[in-house]
């Protein structure tokens, strides 16, 4: 009797995976760009289950998966969401726009922007990568990227890691710059590896005023560690990275709200050959 009562009490404060109807409601809010109710008290398993249902519905609408995003890879951002580990979501066709794109400031219900970076997978060996060096061997491009996530719920500050997972880590849009090819020669590759950790990433407005930024090593001590983590997390759910997939590494900056008329440029100082990437909000 006491045991039964205990189980009842525990489950009363613990939410479950969103129902199919709730997942459909989440999609309706996503499409309408209106804030959805916050998922409450989700466990990590509930968050993953909800992400699966939400992505099934997103795929019917958005089409092909073009890659994945690792989120909460920066300890400062983890702290904001009261968690100590990264999360992941799927990127769909049409989400990645070219540098210079003009985007509505209200592109989502809870629109934000951040300094990020993409890499492109060259080889399935990436799924066994355990170090940044091994990741570099399995990618062929490093791409400057301003991500435009949408936290899409009524009260984003109340989201925890599982809640962020449930909403597909806020994947909505992003603006990609000119790809930087990964060099062939060993010495140049080593220099690139070091530059990725040491680079200073800055966000500036149209007048050149600094909006935010951070260092390469702010992401899991080396940004390519985000790929090591992501590959392992995906494999736990039976997914492997494939050649051509894009991977978003996470945020080098705080998440900032856009406003109409603002132009934002991300620069990667200390990363030779990396051109700035720009987005304008209308």
Could you tell me what each predicted segment is?
Residues 16-222, 275-277, 282:
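Catalytic-core "active-site belt" of small-molecule-metabolizing enzymes
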Residues 10-15:
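Sec/Tat signal peptide C-region and signal peptidase I cleavage site
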Residues 1-9:
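Bacterial N-terminal signal peptides
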Residues 253-256, 270-273:
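Short, charged beta-turn/beta-strand-edge "cap" motif at the junction between a beta-strand
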